[in-house]
Amino acid sequence: MYAVFQSGGKQHRVSEGQTLRLEKLEAETGANVEFDCVLLVANGEEVTVGAPFVTGGKVTAEVVTHGRGDKIKVVKFRRRKHSRKQMGHRQWFTEVKITGISA
């Protein structure tokens, strides 16, 4: 059984027991969170597609940890001007473990 849900402006395909990194959620470590923006639920040969969301569809997960991703370097270079700007960015994330899928 798997589901596709929406969180943080992105869509994720998940199954029970899977861990994944999402955009930062305001939840404590160890807390349970529910995602009700479920786009698709598949159980074997039975597939339910929402328009846009599946009615009664829910994905539950447990917050494992919060953290920051790898550093990305951004360079803005101005040719022939002897000028450049260098910045770094580390995106916050929340790692969750999927505990249940219901439709």
Swiss-Prot record:
CC per GO annotation: cytoplasm; ribonucleoprotein complex; ribosome
Phylogenetic placement of the source organism: Bacteria, Pseudomonadati, Pseudomonadota, Gammaproteobacteria, Vibrionales
Tagged with keyword Ribonucleoprotein: yes
Gene of this entry: rplU
Protein's UniProt name: Large ribosomal subunit protein bL21
Functional description taken from the UniProt entry: This protein binds to 23S rRNA in the presence of protein L20.
Subunit structure: Part of the 50S ribosomal subunit. Contacts protein L20.
Pfam families in UniProt: Ribosomal_L21p (PF00829)
InterPro entries: bL21-like, bL21-like_sf, Ribosomal_bL21, Ribosomal_bL21_CS
NCBIfam families per the UniProt record, alphabetical: L21 (TIGR00061)
Family classification: Belongs to the bacterial ribosomal protein bL21 family.
